[in-house]
Amino acid sequence: MGLFGLLKYAYSNRLVKHDAITTPPGIMTPIAIDLWNVMYTLMEKFDQERNFPLDGAAVTARCFFSLLRLLLKRSYYPIFVSDRGIYGDGRVKQGAKAIVSQTMSSYGGSGRLSSACFTGDEHDTEFQEDPEENDVSVPPQDTCPPTEISAGYVEPERKCEHSSTRWSALDGAPRLSYRLCVNLIRHLGYPYVNACNLEADDVCANLYHTNTVAQIYTTDTDLILMGCDIILDIMPLFPPTLRCCDVLMDLGVTYDEFLTEFVRCHTDLHEPQTLASVQSVISSLHSPPDEDEGADMPQTPSGHSWRCPNERRVISWRRQDDHDYDSSTEDSDQSDSSEEEEECPAGKGFGYRENPAVETCKRRTRPRRSAEASGRILHLKYTSRYPPIMESAPRALVRMAPPKTRHEVLERKFVKHVVSMLTPERRGSLSIMRRLPITQEPSNFSLVHDTLKNLVSEHEIARELANMFWNHIPTPTDYNTVLVNYWDDCGHRRQWS
């Protein structure tokens, strides 16, 4: 789920940091919660520890109570997000799974492949992409009001899995009660986003890049590909956190390079035979070119041809300056960077910075992180941001060669989708990025009690759960107050480090 092999790479290179909570008492950190991803993880842990049978609704209520208690202890303020809206009955029109479904559902139409691509050789089939490709530059804002839901609470679409032995498919595993979860969120008074036509990943990315939430609680690593910072687990006292800027600086690449090259590792876009691991992409990008220049260009493990047809793609470990591609470095041993950049042939219509292969081996032994990259981290009141992510995102599409195979079409459409999410609208001299609307209903504990009484089969367990929520879960603060306390800051306190 996410980027195949990214967590292994992050842990092996010590990119997962265990940070302490830095906010003072009374100041809560707003985070987005990928609801179903987190709930499935908690229910799996709870099911492994319990030694007595419980129905699915009771297990769901206990896990949700544990989640809220942990969030309170860590001073986290949750904003809940789910696929296809909070009720799970919407129809996703954007995102990785929607792109795969729309592209593969028909042989013709906007941006789809001809029937020849579905027979014979998979890797080198030519096609023409329709110029009238669906434009997703403006994310839709439609939401489903509660009054439009009658029976409601459709089971949300789950992540594509490569194994049939997942925990929820095992015999005797308790089923997640979606209706119970949604009703508890609403009646306890917690905020949520009800975007019916978006995946949870896209909603979380929108909340993150509009400076609504500081981080995202999920185990789905494709949010790193969208430039976000994620919390992997809130149970430890110092929650493990993976930041996109740490991955970029460790690899020594810009965000547009990271997006265009590592999109091959996205598990929702690729089937197992075309899916590449993060380690294989790193090895292929930093390997020296073939000695025989006249030989055909080699394929990557996922079947991708090299982006530049005449020479192999090489990214050095040295960090490139994000805002000035033609600037030279300050170090005397890197004076060769002022030479003219190599580009692909003019007929291809795209180019990017290349480094000679002889320099690549030398640069590998140098530290991957650089002072220039670290100096661009923007420290805010209680958190930090990395502006080069949004600055370099529009260059991603320029870097990509015209697609020739169906999985390259999926990659290009997904990159276009991510770029559209990260690119602000220009209105005169202003750059505007619209945040998805957040809903917060008034707290009503009578409805919480009714929900537990109606959905939990054992009345004694329902009464016990109601007492737990009543005694230990306070009424949440208005989310606008939390956002103002966390993000609002005087100009003299915002600094570059």
Swiss-Prot record:
Residues 309-326 have a biased composition (Basic and acidic residues). Residues 122-142, 280-373 are annotated as: Disordered. GO terms for cellular component: virion component. The keyword RNA-binding applies. It comes from Equine herpesvirus 1 (strain Ab4p). This is Virion host shutoff protein. Minor structural protein that acts as an endoribonuclease during lytic infection. Degrades host mRNAs in the cytoplasm by cutting them at preferred sites, including some in regions of translation initiation. It comes from the Viruses. Residues 327-344 have a biased composition (Acidic residues).
